[in-house]
């Protein structure tokens, strides 16, 4: 009797134990495969969202919080800095380009970002409908924002302070949706740009 025949004979003696072992091995292997795929997808998304960004400058506070809020828009901002302080960096001879961001308000959990067209260009943002904001209280929204909130061109809404939905609503100032971005699989899909 060779080793293969001996192994098969042993497996056939306890079919329930064999089936449970095969099931557990399959579940373990599947779990590891799912974790590896999820890690790869998350890593690719983080790299894609940080493309072409070398430095994040912001208010005093936690560097991690600054990166999470200013780059990935996944945390509460450390605060805004004065434009005069930002200009020091923006006009520095070693800085090729600088993009200002103003954070703090949201709509239904999606961050409202005050910035300029350069921010959209970093992510190769293309409009599916409408135009980029050019006037006060005009806003262009990401594809995920449009789907989740039901906002469309011409819709108006009031932003609210903070990200958690419990902040003060700015009912006195309503934004008007003037553009909707195409899906880009970047952070731009989850933002409202004004």
What is each stretch, according to the model?
Residues 36-111, 118-121, 135:
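Hydrophobic, regular-secondary-structure patches
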Residues 1-5:
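Short, membrane-interfacial amphipathic segments enriched in basic
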């Amino acid at each position: 009797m060779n080793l293969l025949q001996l192994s098969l004979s042993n497996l056939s003696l306890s079919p329930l134990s064999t089936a449970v072992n095969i099931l557990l091995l399959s579940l373990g292997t599947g779990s590891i495969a799912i974790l590896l795929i999820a890690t790869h997808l998350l890593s690719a998304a983080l790299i894609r969202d940080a493309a072409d960004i070398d430095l994040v400058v912001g208010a005093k506070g936690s560097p991690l919080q600054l990166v999470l809020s200013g780059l990935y828009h996944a945390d509460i901002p450390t605060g805004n800095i004065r434009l005069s302080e930002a200009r020091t960096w923006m006009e520095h001879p070693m800085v090729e380009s600088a993009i200002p961001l103003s954070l703090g308000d949201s709509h239904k959990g999606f961050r409202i970002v005050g910035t300029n067209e350069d921010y959209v260009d970093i992510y190769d943002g293309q409009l599916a409908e409408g135009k980029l904001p050019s006037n006060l209280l005009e806003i262009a929204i990401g594809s995920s924002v449009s789907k989740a909130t039901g906002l469309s061109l011409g819709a108006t809404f009031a932003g609210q302070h903070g990200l958690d939905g419990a902040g003060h609503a700015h009912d006195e100032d309503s934004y008007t949706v003037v553009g909707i971005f195409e899906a880009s699989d970047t952070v731009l899909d989850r933002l409202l740009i004004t």
